[in-house]
């Protein structure tokens, strides 16, 4: 019966693990809807502020804002990387880091230096291993982040761009498509695309009256746009994290259930074998008498 006891111990251990993964699945599921609503709530604001900036670019075309000017020469590229603080979310971080590293290698082949600002412990650990210089990091950020909780981390990167020390800035994170699909995405944050603004301007013919002037309003709005873009990217990544964790824990719970059935079958066979052996020994003893 020693083999049966070992199997029974394994079953008990797997059931204990299954309870944990089931609980984590339920916790993630309870958060998914809330963080998705928070994430989706910011998308209309992002669309409208892009339209306003597009018209402001047209109105102040005589003096192009520094955030819109393409550099003559690129020496240093910055990445704002948004990862998770915790694991157990499937391949979410792994896929993101693969995409990021391919992009970094492409920039390094061009002779560009790399610096980064990182959200989340997983990203910090990855870029430290890759020996990428980190300008700033933020860990344990909230599930429904507010702008003032995030802007401190991105200021060193933005200031580096303003001083001309960084010529390009990319924002890297997962974009939520649906509960089953999270897409790692790299988007150029600075310099902002003038072509994008022209396209938006051509589509909408209305205009504003600017007070005091279009340039000062554009400066303020571009700063708000950068802050909100980072906030929205963090919100998207959190929604991806919760969905990925829910699916990962559901898969783990299902696998645990299948393993329990398999172990239970082995246990029954081992117990049957032990009982058959005992009966055989009893019958053999009776025959001997």
Swiss-Prot record:
The principal location of this protein is: membrane
| Membrane topology (UniProt) | Peripheral membrane protein
Q: InterPro entries given for it?
A: ATP_synth_F1_ATPase_gsu, ATP_synth_F1_gsu, ATP_synth_F1_gsu_CS
Subcellular location, in the record's words? Cell inner membrane
Q: What's an example GO BP annotation here?
A: proton motive force-driven plasma membrane ATP synthesis
Quote one Gene Ontology molecular function term: ATP binding
List the signal peptide residues.
none
Keywords carried by this UniProt record? ATP synthesis, Cell inner membrane, Cell membrane, CF(1), Hydrogen ion transport, Ion transport, Membrane, Transport
Q: What's a Pfam family in this record?
A: ATP-synt
Q: What does this protein do?
A: Produces ATP from ADP in the presence of a proton gradient across the membrane. The gamma chain is believed to be important in regulating ATPase activity and the flow of protons through the CF(0) complex.
**PANTHER family in the record:** ATP SYNTHASE GAMMA CHAIN (PTHR11693), ATP SYNTHASE SUBUNIT GAMMA, MITOCHONDRIAL (PTHR11693:SF22)
Q: What is this protein called?
A: ATP synthase gamma chain
Query: Lineage of the source organism?
Result: Bacteria, Pseudomonadati, Pseudomonadota, Gammaproteobacteria, Cardiobacteriales
